[in-house]
């Protein structure tokens, strides 16, 4: 598929996601699957979109192997890789596989740190990790992570909010 054809395919996929709320879960999966069928069967971008459709439709056990295959290809760009990791981490949480979710999200968080400022979806990784920690019963750690993630986005009190979030985890606070 040429670059122009791939861009056209991506545009049509994006158009489907724009109307996803108007489709039934089954229609969304069918529509994305039809678009994915235009690509090779092992195409990581098509696998990723198929996983997203199943995830959105509440078919987590169908999404998981597709996310894994897309990630295993090593061909996803940093943004899609981050999205696939985040979404697979969330899927694993929904499937009750909390430790696996945490490991995957921590690995993605490390990739974000290695990429430096502006890493794709850094805050989003942290938000989903906080949900995993809540599901594990680690609510104080989850709250600290969520508040520390939020702090830079506040119009005021950024430093004090970040410091207070970190202080939640100090032994004297427990």
Enumerate the predicted regions with their spans:
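TPR-repeat structural position
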Residues: 22-26, 60, 98, 139
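Amphipathic alpha-helical segments of tetratricopeptide repeats
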Residues: 32-33, 68-72, 106-113, 147-152
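Structural signature of alpha-solenoid helical repeat junctions
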Residues: 42, 80, 117-121, 157-160
């Amino acid at each position: 598929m040429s670059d122009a054809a791939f861009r056209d395919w991506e545009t049509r996929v994006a158009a489907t996601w724009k109307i996803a709320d108007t489709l039934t879960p089954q229609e969304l999966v069918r529509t994305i699957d039809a678009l994915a069928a235009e690509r090779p069967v092992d195409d990581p971008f098509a696998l990723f979109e198929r996983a997203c459709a199943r995830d959105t439709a509440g078919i987590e056990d169908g999404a998981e192997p597709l996310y894994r295959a897309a990630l295993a290809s090593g061909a996803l760009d940093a943004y899609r890789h981050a999205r696939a990791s985040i979404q697979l981490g969330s899927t694993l949480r929904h499937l009750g596989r909390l430790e696996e979710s945490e490991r995957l999200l921590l690995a993605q968080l490390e990739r974000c740190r290695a990429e430096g400022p502006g890493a794709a979806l850094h805050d989003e990784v942290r938000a989903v990790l906080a949900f995993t920690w809540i599901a594990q019963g680690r609510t104080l750690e989850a709250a600290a992570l969520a508040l520390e993630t939020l702090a830079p986005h506040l119009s005021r009190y950024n430093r004090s909010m970040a410091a207070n979030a970190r202080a939640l985890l100090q032994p004297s606070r427990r």
